[in-house]
Every structure is written in structure tokens, then in C-alpha cells.
Amino acid sequence: MSGKFVRASKYRHVFGQAAKKELQYEKLKVTNNAWDSNLLKTNGKFIAVNWNASGGGAFAVIPIEEVGKAPDQVPLFRGHTAQVLDTDFDPFNDHRIASGSDDSKIGIWDIPENYKFHDHVDEDGEPIDIKPVKFLTGHARKVGHVLYHPVAENVLASSSGDYTVKLWNVETGKDMITLKHPDMVTSMSFSYDGNYLATVARDKKLRVWNIREEKIVSEGPAHTGAKNQRVVWLGNSDRLATTGFSKLSDRQIGIWDAFNIEKGDLGGFYTVDQSSGILMPFYDEGNKILYLVGKGDGNIRYYEFQNDELFELSEFQSTEAQRGFAVAPKRMVNVKENEVLKGFKTVVDQRIEPVSFFVPRRSEEFQEDIYPDAPSNKPALTAEEWFSGKSVEGPILVSMRSIYDGSAPSFHEAKRPQQPTTQETALEEKKEQPKVEKPISESEKEVKQEAPKSPSPLKSASSSSTINHVLKEDNSINKLLKKSSDIDQVNNAEDPSRDTSGWEEADDEPAPIKIETPVTPTETKKDRTPKVEPSKELKPEPVSIATDRKQEQSLPQEEKSSEKTKSPEQEKSATPPSSITAAKTAITASSKEEPSAARTSPKSLGLKKSVEKLSTLVLQLEDVVDKLTKANLDKDERLLKLEQKIGELSK
């Protein structure tokens, strides 16, 4: 994903660490139900786990601090008549939790203030089960997933086997909004501001809904594999991440523009491996890190998300596979130990193992760069306000510094990101830095140079006509040719287009001069000087200013040498500087080449110097033409995409 080179990132050394055995939760009875859910949920104070209970469905709630072995008889949250499939904590009430069940009901539960998992018993020593506060009814089939709203309190989303997603006012118990799907929803995720909901269903399609309008904003095919898919909204952005499978059962990750799913995933699917377990995605908005937890394996991969690309950071490996995983809110991490994620995984359906991820730093001060403000437990809206149409830009944020200092928490409203996230801006950013985030190997570069993408006819015609127009308007080549002609006249050179440079007796001497044209570091041409054919046409193209200045500086020196050259002895001393100037470099001729150059006749030297200059110009012009061609093709590609976008917006 990021190639085999080392990226500069402050999260490059993030590592995962499992808790010691004495800090784990043991002797648990995790459900063996095959329904695809995370099995665990946590709010940083409690852990909810779907329980393998008889006589109807139930789940257990474990306070974080009550580690160790569970007693034989534990208090359970009972009330459903069938298996509990999913749970979710209220983000604005640490003692409120919702559950979805196979009995088509949604249970709302309150955790008692004095609740203890190990010692919540009556006078006879029997565990006291907790009853639901209310049931929400309205689904016709099992409720597979429940999810609380991130901004408004008492707003709950639920997906069911009746192919619908319902939005509930928990306080009144009414289903206010129903989003109908053609198949069962397997995963859903709210946007940062809570106005949109992303869903993936068994029809293999990804959808983004404007919830209160009950309309699909964007829709398109996602992963092609037969197994369930997952979706997560990537924080305060308009990007989504999905996990799924290809037709060949490769596990994949996809990045999407939430409001333009039709154009496909951004940059192609990332192939992870060929394991059979579903990848559970968790996104950390504060650090821009996407964690992928494999269901049925012990690996947790994590990637940094930047500029619509994922860059692999590392992988937490374990020999003990997990079926369930839960992540605590960011405000619950250990700030003093530079913990960036607090997670919990199930192990062999009998144990819950805490897993934390850390940024290794020695400083004992507050690390402000890795701890931006995080969502708090304060709601930004009430249920009535949200259902009536009121919106905010995001949840109420709490300062992580206040948590570090132990002072009174400071809150403020979330704001939209400063960078514009429109499609045009995203395309421009990717065009300006195409090789910084996803570098291309040398072999791929060679393939691209040999067989570039064939542009559309419109693009090709536009680019060629643009280049021709630019070349016709540019008069710099005429000036350069005039300078070259003046130099030839100064050195008494013959016109190379005329066949008058026959061999003379003086030309029969052995060891002719061999002048090589040095190539500047930016040039990719061969070192040897190619032959110049009289019939070759030079395409007009701007040449670097540095070359012009060097040639202008060489002119007065050569004029003086030609005026003072009265005898062969004086001409011998003037020849090496002029040949070096013609080569436009600072490389000095060797002592062996100087005598042979001095023995060459003035006429042949002048001709060779003009050939040398023309050869250098040809190489430079070819290089500039290549660069101009590439730049114009890139420009036309951007213009074409802009036109397509304008056309879509105008419809």
C-alpha cells in the first residue's frame, strides 16, 4: 500500500500490546451465534458481551475495573425471548445501552449506579438480573445491528432482516424514519455531523442516505465477493472505507467518495490477504489511523489515511484468534502513556483480552500533536431538534489536554475541516503530487514510458494542437540558431548543408579529435554525441536561460581569439577554451586531448564545434518537448475530468 520504502510519519512506530493475564477477563460465556456482529461493545467504563444464555437471549455488562475470573453465576441483562445479536452504548449516557435481538425487538437498558459484575446479588446470594427500561417495536424480522447517533441524544438507528433501517426517538419509543433497502443491511455508519448514513447490504451495494429526506445521495457496487461487507465513515471527511471480498475470496479494503460512489473506489481496492474471516474496521479520527481486525484470526492491521490513500503502518500479531472486538472512545485512553487506542478482543469465546496501541515517546509532557480534541459525552442536539431538521457540524469536543492535566474539561463545537473536500480540489491535489504518496517502482516507470495510456481522441487532438501553437508562438529558437550561426562565422566554419568539406592533405593525419558531449544530471540521454543529419528539422522549443548566458559569455572570448589568431602557434592556445565553451560544461579537457586538438586544422575545428552545438541543442530540445507533451497531457486530463464533473452537476 505504501510500497517498500520508509515513509516519514509520526505514527510509523505505533505498536500494539496485549494486557497481562491478571488484567484480562476470564471464565466468560461468549455467544456462539453465527450472526455477523462484533459481539463486544465498550464505552470505556463498561464492556457489553453477547452471552451464551439459555431460556432466551441475554448479554452481560462488565465494569472495566472488574478484571479476573468471573463467578459461576453472573448478573445478566435479560428480557429478550431470542438471541441478542448486537448492542451499543449511548455516547451521551454511560449507563444506557441498547440491544437488538432475533425476536425483532430493540431493548433499552439502564445500568444501575451500584452495579457490580462479580457481586451484584440479592440477600440470598443469587445474582440480580437487569430488566429493560423499554422495548422498541416496529421491525418485522430480527434486528441485526443497532447504532446510536453521534451528535443527537436519544436517536438510535437499527437494521433488520425486513430490509429496512429505522431511526428511533428513544425517548418516545417511535420510529421516525424508515430507509428501505432491496436486501438485508450488513453494516452501517453515521457521518461525522450525523446527517448522512452509509450502508452496505447483501446486494453488494454501498449507499449513502440523506437520513431526514429518506433519499439516497449516492449509490454504487462495492466488493464483488459473496460474504458480508463492512463500512465505516472516515471521521470529519466525505470519505468512506469498506472491507469485503473479491470474487477470488481476497480480503479487500476500498476507499470511496461518499457523495460520488458511482465513479468507483478511489485508487482501486487494496488487497490484504486471502483469509476467510471478515475484516472489522475501526477508524481513529484524531490520528487518522484505520484499524482492521480480522474475524477468526489474531491479526490487527493498521493504516494511516492520508490524501485518499492508505499507508500501512504495522500489524499486531497474535496466535489467539478473535471473533469479537470493541474500541473505547478516544477520551478514555491513557494520555500519560501515549495510548492512542484502547481495544478489547474475545479469545476462544471464554476470555476478553485488552489490547492497547501506543506511540513510543520518552517525553513526559502532553503530546498535543497526537491528541487533538475528541468527541465528548455532551450531546450537540436533542432528538426533537434533530428530527425537526436542525444540524450542526459535528459532536461537542472535549480538550484532551484538560484530561491530561486532570482539570475541569473544556468543551467546544466541532468545525468543518479547513481544507475543501470537493472533487475538483481532491483531483488537483493528486495531480500536483502524484508520486509522493504512492511511489511507482522503476519497472512500472519503464512500462509507462514505453506504453503510455492511450488518451481519448479529444484529448490527443487538443494536446497536439496546443503544443504546436506554443511552439509557433515561441521565437527563442530563432535567436539560438542566429547565435550558433554567428559563432560559426567567428570560427570560420563552413555551412554543414553544403557538400564542400572535402578531405585535405592536412586531414589525413592520424588520431582525430574526439569530443564528447557531457550530459547534465537532469538529462537522460546517452553520453556520446549523436551525428547530426543536414535534413533533420529542429522543432522550435524554449531552451534554458543558463545555456544562453553561457553562449553569450563565450562569444567575446572567441571573437578576441579569432582576431588575434595570426599564426598556428596562437591558434593552438585558443582552441581548448572554445571547445570547452561549445560543450557548455565545466569539464576540462585532458592533457592527452589538447595536443591532438591543436593539430586539427582550423576549418575542421570550426565545423566540429558547430556540429557540437547543434547536437547539444537537439538533445535539450527533445527533452523539453517531452516535458511539454507530458504537462499538456496532464492538463487536458484534468480539464476533461472537470468538464465531466460540470456536466454531472448541471444535470
UniProtKB/Swiss-Prot annotation:
Pfam families tied to this protein: DUF1899, WD40, WD40_4
Keywords for the protein's UniProt record, in alphabetical order: Actin-binding, Coiled coil, Phosphoprotein, Repeat, WD repeat
GO CC, one annotated term: actin cortical patch
Quaternary structure and interacting proteins, as annotated: Binds to F-actin.
Note: Present with 2900 molecules/cell in log phase SD medium.
Family affiliation: Belongs to the WD repeat coronin family.
Name recorded for this polypeptide: Coronin-like protein
Provenance organism: Saccharomyces cerevisiae (strain ATCC 204508 / S288c) (Baker's yeast)
Originating gene: CRN1
